[in-house]
């Protein structure tokens, strides 16, 4: 039975990714014009901690947005319907971390390919 006196502080949907290296997260963000936009820095706390403590996790590959085409994802539904600010999709590459020489070449394009890859894998 649902206990209405409790809150959900964190939701993470975990996926494998077949087109990118590393471990990274997609999170939601309030529109800049919203009074709630001050929470956008809070949304990045967990990914920042993971970036500092987990070698395979790369903050540069993370993306924080509410995209129309992703409205049906668990992360966005829970963010909007249950107001779970810390609602994420964590992606982990099937291929491991980015090889050092590839990382050096990608520094300028900041892994632009991931913009279309959100929840690409396993029915995401």
Please name every model-derived segment.
Residues 1-124:
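Structured catalytic-domain cores with a bias toward divalent-metal coordination
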């Amino acid at each position: 039975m649902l206990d209405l006196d409790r809150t959900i502080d964190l939701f993470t949907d975990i996926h494998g990714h077949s087109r990118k290296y590393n471990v990274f997260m997609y999170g939601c963000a309030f529109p800049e014009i919203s009074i709630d936009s001050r929470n956008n820095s809070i949304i990045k706390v967990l990914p920042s901690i993971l970036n500092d403590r987990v070698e395979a996790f790369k903050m540069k590959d993370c993306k924080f947005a509410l995209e129309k085409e992703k409205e049906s994802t668990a992360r966005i539904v829970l963010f909007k319907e249950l107001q779970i600010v810390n609602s994420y999709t964590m992606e982990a590459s099937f291929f491991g971390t980015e090889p050092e020489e590839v990382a050096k070449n990608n520094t300028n394009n900041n892994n632009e390919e991931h913009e279309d890859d959100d929840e690409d894998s396993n029915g995401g």
